[in-house]
Amino acid sequence: MRRVTSVYVWLTVVVKDNTIIATAIPRITDQFKALEDVGWYGSSYLLVTCMFQLIFGKLYGYFPIKWVFLAAIIIFEIGSAVCGAAPTSDAFILEMVVSTYLPEPFDHVLSAGSFYINLPIGAVVIVVLLQFLHVPNTVPVEASSKTLFQHMDPLGVVTFLPAIVCLLLALQWGGTTFPWANGRIIALFVLAGVLLIAFLAIQRKRQDNAMVPPRIITMHPVAFSSLFMTLFAGAYFTIIYYLPIWFQAIKNASAVNSGIMCLPLMLSMVIFSFVAGGGVTATGNPVPFFYIATVLAAAGAGLMTTFEVHTGHPKWIGYQVLLGSGVGMGIQLPIIAVQAVLPAADIPVGTAILTFCQTFGGAIFVSVAQAVFANRLQTGLLRAVPGVSPGLVQEVGATNLDTVIDAQHMGAVKVVYNDALVSAWYLAVALFSVAVLGAVGMSTKRKSA
């Protein structure tokens, strides 16, 4: 029981980082004066997480599980320490990458404290795991260093990561730093496409030794579950990364209070995850819950696009509950569906692929949402408030607008800011809606006993 408890405590730390970053982002943009880097704060964390989900999944097969897990915790702790001490936005993004190797009393220290708090918790977990975590009946596969290196699919890594980085750079710079027709942006999109094609060719050639084995990903239940997970998670992360900004920039909430104001979303997610789990267990068929989840989530996200500067508590609480009920019901369904149809030997790989898709969808679509937000903010300010520099608004961050914008322009700036955030949420509505295609292709056939 103690070893199970220690593992769950550590999982709580990791989950905390997935959500606390979103709440701390407005404060981080103030500290580093880099509103344009919001997309990178989420995408860098999620991108490297999705990559190392698959790599660590393979490492567990070649080395003792306990020591691989402990090594990952130590790397995570180092990343948390350097994130808390990051002096610039660029350094923070780089250090976020380090902290993703594992699958506050005062508002002004929230951004650093969010990461430093991991250190004592991690130290306690390491001590407990050293004492009580015993993994029985695990025999690591013996392999030479050369064989191990090859099985990590290095060619897949060196084609996939640069491809996604090129794509994120194009989305980040397009329309703001450079025009969409600029040669740099076009070159980045072309290079991303070429590298992704190379990655797919490598996966096909390597088969079961690939990062994403074609034999498994092409199975109908896995393919459609992966599609659903990528779109559904992308929509969720798009909401959760920009909702705290809305509370802090539009409602003047502190970072701590904005976290509290997001509780309706989080609590409804928890409750309806149990509802979905119980429903699937009772009926033996996850497909109806896919449809219900997409309808609820799309409806909730759609209602959130009606947010205005003066939207009151009943609406932003109620809409979050509706959205959270759909997300909580749907976010775990792909894993349940895949585990119900895959042979036992393939379940770990299938689960790893879906976890990969979850964070991959977040990495890509948070960056897309940032491109939408930044472009709408810039064009909106130029059109509606010509006396205010878009560059100044982006440099000052999300919560210090009143320090550089005079009172006569503040109302108009908030309206433009609100419209830019809402525009990013339209992307979430579209993703939730299209995710229903995953349910259409889902197999309801359960694996034989």
Swiss-Prot record:
Topology of this chain in the membrane: Multi-pass membrane protein
Alphabetical list of InterPro entries matching this protein: MFS_trans_sf
Keywords attached to this entry: Cell membrane, Glycoprotein, Membrane, Transmembrane, Transmembrane helix
A GO-annotated cellular component: plasma membrane
Superkingdom, taxonomy of origin: Eukaryota
Gene3D superfamilies hit by this protein: MFS general substrate transporter like domains
Keyword Zinc-finger: no
Subcellular location: Cell membrane
Main location: membrane
UniProt-recorded Gene Ontology molecular function terms: transmembrane transporter activity
Mutant phenotype after disruption: Strongly reduces the production of acetylaranotin.
Keyword Membrane: yes
Segments crossing the lipid bilayer: 6-26, 45-65, 67-87, 115-135, 155-175, 182-202, 227-247, 260-280, 287-307, 321-341, 349-369, 420-440
Chain positions carrying an annotated carbohydrate: 252
Family statement drawn from the similarity comment of this UniProt entry: Belongs to the major facilitator superfamily.
Described function: Efflux pump that may provide the dual role of acetylaranotin export and self-protection by allowing the fungus to evade the harmful effect of its own acetylaranotin production.
Designated name of the protein: MFS acetylaranotin efflux transporter ataA
Organism per entry: Aspergillus terreus (strain NIH 2624 / FGSC A1156)
Gene: ataA
